[in-house]
Amino acid sequence: MRGFDTVDSPWQECMAPFIAVWHETQKDLPASGIRFLSSGFIERSARYCGIAQDMAEKLVRVARTIEEDPGLRSVAWFLHHGLWINRIHGIRMSEWPVPTETLKEDAGLFYVIVLLAGVPRLQGIYRRLGMPSGVVRDTVAELDRRMGESGSFFRTYGSPGIDAKTLGWLLMIWDAELYQIGRFQFGLSSHSGVIRAYRSTSTGSLVALSEDDRIFLPNGLNDGSGGISGLENSWTATLEGTENETMGYPISPSGFAVNKKIRLPKCEWVEVFSKGSPTLDFHIPAGPPMDFEVCGRSLQDAISFFRQFFPEKPFVAFESWSWILDPVFPDILPPDSNLVRFQREVYLYPCLRGSGDSMPAEVRRGEGGRATSMEKRFSEYLSSGGKFNSGGFFLMIEDFDWGSQPYHQQELPW
């Protein structure tokens, strides 16, 4: 098949399930002069994404190298068609290689160029939606952030760029499914179903119950959290209901499962959040500290934004999973720290993630490489045998009142 024998074997393995599509796309491969590899196209697309001029010039040089390499130009053409012209479903981008043998220290720029090829398509989507220029600018700037020192590729290889896994994540932005609104990024999603929430019709209190058959450690975190599993006295939550009541194990707003079965009369407690409930998914890009007031404005603006531009898609809660939601942070950090104050505004719940006995990769050094107060506290915590976890949170839209700590001020039925 045209060009396939010029492609290195790692690429061939990834593309083997799509060999028929490969064959079709290669029929249209120009003999020379692929448009999205031209200097003008690269420069315009890089500028649109807020990429600095010196990096744009490097991308132009790398694009020229790709154009001159039969294997790389064939792969780039295939991905261009499979991502931006006629989406191929089932591509596991996390398994695709980085072309280090051909592009050396610039290997991470290959997938950047593949993303830049999709800029015209993205521009068309934004135009149809009437997207504000400020939101567009802030959203597409995520590519530049991911290419830089805060990105996983730079931390691994010491050079700018992205790998295929990061490209797969950035598809949420290139498909116009994720938007940066202030400090955070948001997208329409739905609750995965690890907890359910019930509201009292008499007091307005909100209680989360674990889904059925979840195993918890004695401390109330998920079995496996922080790399710890199978401890004695671990326990399994159940969730069941009758015509008159719901019975299950509660999750405290601070993020720990409680080994005490409670009963919620259905005449008073109404289910308001469960698997499939529409949410605003919440992501935390690299950036400045999470100033408390800035965080609140970001969430408030996100509510207004999605109600304006996607009125046909209502949502009932914010939701996220992240290292910043580790429920042990209040025991490590001061109560006035940004992370602890953020946690107090939302309803935390345990989930199966965490860096265990290593520092979360997202923790940054201060200016001049000096350890920050957070890093020092985290190091002391690890030295004492502590483990890091991740956590989840939800915040019902009707409870949003930044600074009020709604779930920590309510009475709980246990």
Task: Go through each PLM region and give its residues.
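Conserved acetyl-CoA-binding loop-helix of GNAT-fold acetyltransferases
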Residues: 290-308
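Non-catalytic substrate-recognition and accessory regions of acyl/acetyltransferase enzymes
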Residues: 2-290, 311-317, 331-414
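Short beta-alpha junction loops
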Residues: 319-326
